[in-house]
């Protein structure tokens, strides 16, 4: 059994270089919600040195709200914005001897693409037109994953170690109780259940089936690094190989 571990980096949390020793995929902020050219270059350089798969983490242009405020934009604007951010990170990756392997939208763009076909198609079209060999990371069972596969992209279904789920498989909004899980033992057990048994218990009590192919480890918070170490150690102790997804692995559940 195999699983990818990913983290969102270049967002000013301070533990990026150390997290790259634990994850197999890095989603690097492209400057629109956090980060900037220097942060992007640092993260890319570290990822290349450590052999971690490089991914772009595009967002709405909304640094004031860390890219977490929902926006209603024309699909053409979303398409152009994603292309712009992919181009920036790709140039830096090329200069550092690496290349982008995947794309994972950030924040509100991620959540809206997960449920809105128009937004999903705009993001997918930008990725496909930029480089159809790129894999797409998205919420398991989401509209975004379906759109990516429909376009012929490798789709990697993502689950979250420390986020609450609703019965429809969507994440509990951060503004609501139960959105974030703070108990480390509960998160460890939940992660193992998602990876080995392909299910998660929703906030309302139902079991939700999902195809976990990559687990997001959040890098912010004072104990994030130590907790990431615990999650990786628990997975390896359970006999799970932690590896970056290839195109064939990505679509094994399609």
UniProtKB/Swiss-Prot annotation:
The protein's matches in Pfam families, at most eight in alphabetical order, are given as: LamB_YcsF
What EC number(s) does the entry state? 3.5.2.9
The UniProt entry, under SUPFAM superfamilies, shows:
Glycoside hydrolase/deacetylase
Known InterPro entries for this protein?
Glyco_hydro/deAcase_b/a-brl (IPR011330), LamB/YcsF/PxpA-like (IPR005501)
Q: What keywords is this UniProt entry annotated with? A: ATP-binding, Hydrolase, Nucleotide-binding
Which top EC class is given? hydrolase
The UniProt catalytic activity note for this protein reads:
5-oxo-L-proline + ATP + 2 H2O = L-glutamate + ADP + phosphate + H(+)
GO terms of molecular function: 5-oxoprolinase (ATP-hydrolyzing) activity; ATP binding
Q: Which Gene Ontology terms describe the biological processes this protein takes part in? A: carbohydrate metabolic process
Coiled coil start-end: none
Q: Does the keyword Ribosomal protein apply?
A: no
* Cystine bridges: none
Q: Which family does it belong to?
A: Belongs to the LamB/PxpA family.
The family database entries (HAMAP family) matched by this protein are listed as:
PxpA
| Subunit text | Forms a complex composed of PxpA, PxpB and PxpC.
Main function: Catalyzes the cleavage of 5-oxoproline to form L-glutamate coupled to the hydrolysis of ATP to ADP and inorganic phosphate.
Q: Output this protein's name.
A: 5-oxoprolinase subunit A
Query: Which source organism does the UniProt entry give?
Result: Burkholderia orbicola (strain MC0-3)
């Amino acid at each position: 059994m195999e699983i990818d571990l990913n983290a969102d980096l270049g967002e000013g949390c301070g533990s990026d270089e150390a997290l790259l020793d634990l994850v197999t995929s890095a989603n690097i902020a492209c400057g629109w919600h956090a980060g900037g050219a220097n942060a992007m270059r640092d993260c890319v350089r570290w990822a290349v040195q450590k052999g971690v798969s490089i991914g772009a983490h595009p967002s709405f242009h909304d640094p004031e709200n860390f890219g977490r405020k929902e926006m209603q934009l024309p699909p053409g604007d979303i398409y152009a914005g994603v292309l712009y951010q992919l181009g920036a990170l790709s140039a830096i990756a090329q200069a550092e001897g690496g290349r982008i392997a995947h794309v994972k939208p950030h924040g509100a763009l991620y959540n809206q693409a997960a449920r809105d076909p128009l937004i999903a198609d705009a993001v997918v079209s930008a990725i496909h037109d930029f480089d159809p060999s790129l894999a797409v990371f998205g919420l398991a069972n989401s509209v975004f994953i379906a759109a990516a596969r429909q376009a012929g992209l490798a789709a990697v279904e993502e689950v979250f170690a420390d986020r609450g789920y609703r019965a429809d498989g969507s994440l509990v909004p951060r503004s609501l109780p139960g959105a974030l899980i703070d108990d480390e033992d509960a998160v460890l057990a939940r992660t193992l259940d998602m990876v080995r048994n392909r299910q998660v218990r929703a906030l309302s009590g139902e079991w939700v089936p999902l195809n976990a192919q990559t687990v997001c480890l959040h890098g912010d918070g004072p104990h994030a690094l130590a907790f990431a170490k615990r999650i990786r150690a628990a997975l390896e102790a359970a006999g799970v190989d932690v590896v970056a997804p290839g195109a064939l692995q990505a679509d094994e559940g399609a």
